[in-house]
């Protein structure tokens, strides 16, 4: 059996920035270092940081006053920011800059008393943070996951309406919902460029290009990773067996029975070393050759948070 490796795959610029932020903060600050929510949705990465002394918490209420705290890549609501300020925390914000961009759009809608429609998955931390940017008493923010949800909405002022999306959704599915929004509300405003992040788009594009060449897909990523699940879905929608794994021990020989080509990709929060471990495990259970599948080359970089750059002396605080 042959293995085809999707390109690009694995860590995106936002995840790299978030993980590097935690590792650098561990170097410049005294322990313990607290992180609100899993810094990225990958069990291997989180477990590794725990071993280095990071304490993960669900809410800033669990963090002692004046302690060091990091916000995860998914972003937080205004209420969480205010709670952190009251506790006088030494705060490092590892929110992905692309999520921050979505936050700005929602805050602008709120400031203009525009109603806002957010396309996203209920309960996802990014969605909670984005919903929490809206403060207008005259308007409201609504969460929808499908065109069916859209049909149930009652909008008070269609001429003062804005939409935004979670950054890690399916590009194809979201495009359909956005088009339905524009058809129903012709005057709706939204971001100049789609909120779906470049890395999510690129990884989905790479999978689509590879589908006609494979008969099974293994996606390296954790079960709670939204973008990893979307990669798996692209294959299953085409009738191709697909599996989501974040531990080499989870690889099952039966997956590859009577298969000729296995595609391997990784969600934006999965490190390359884990990809290589899983490829090695696949090779153990069935003889394989490994080939890189040509794709988009990513060269995006997001700088570290300003406070951290100041502490380590690699940049100026503006």
Swiss-Prot record:
It comes from Francisella tularensis subsp. holarctica (strain LVS). One of its GO terms (molecular function) is 4 iron, 4 sulfur cluster binding. It comes from the Bacteria. Belongs to the IspH family. (2E)-4-hydroxy-3-methylbut-2-enyl diphosphate binds at residues 41, 74, 124, 167, 225-227, 269. Dimethylallyl diphosphate binds at residues 41, 74, 124, 225-227, 269. This is 4-hydroxy-3-methylbut-2-enyl diphosphate reductase. The keyword GTP-binding does not apply. NCBIfam families: ispH_lytB, PRK01045.1-2, PRK01045.1-4. Binds 1 [4Fe-4S] cluster per subunit. HAMAP family: IspH. Catalyzes the conversion of 1-hydroxy-2-methyl-2-(E)-butenyl 4-diphosphate (HMBPP) into a mixture of isopentenyl diphosphate (IPP) and dimethylallyl diphosphate (DMAPP). Acts in the terminal step of the DOXP/MEP pathway for isoprenoid precursor biosynthesis. InterPro entries: LytB/IspH. Pathway: Isoprenoid biosynthesis; dimethylallyl diphosphate biosynthesis; dimethylallyl diphosphate from (2E)-4-hydroxy-3-methylbutenyl diphosphate: step 1/1; Isoprenoid biosynthesis; isopentenyl diphosphate biosynthesis via DXP pathway; isopentenyl diphosphate from 1-deoxy-D-xylulose 5-phosphate: step 6/6. Its EC number is 1.17.7.4. [4Fe-4S] cluster binds at residues 12, 96, 197. It catalyses: isopentenyl diphosphate + 2 oxidized [2Fe-2S]-[ferredoxin] + H2O = (2E)-4-hydroxy-3-methylbut-2-enyl diphosphate + 2 reduced [2Fe-2S]-[ferredoxin] + 2 H(+); dimethylallyl diphosphate + 2 oxidized [2Fe-2S]-[ferredoxin] + H2O = (2E)-4-hydroxy-3-methylbut-2-enyl diphosphate + 2 reduced [2Fe-2S]-[ferredoxin] + 2 H(+). Keywords: 4Fe-4S, Iron, Iron-sulfur, Isoprene biosynthesis, Metal-binding, Oxidoreductase. GO terms for biological process: dimethylallyl diphosphate biosynthetic process; isopentenyl diphosphate biosynthetic process, methylerythritol 4-phosphate pathway; terpenoid biosynthetic process. Its cofactor is [4Fe-4S] cluster. Isopentenyl diphosphate binds at residues 41, 74, 124, 225-227, 269.
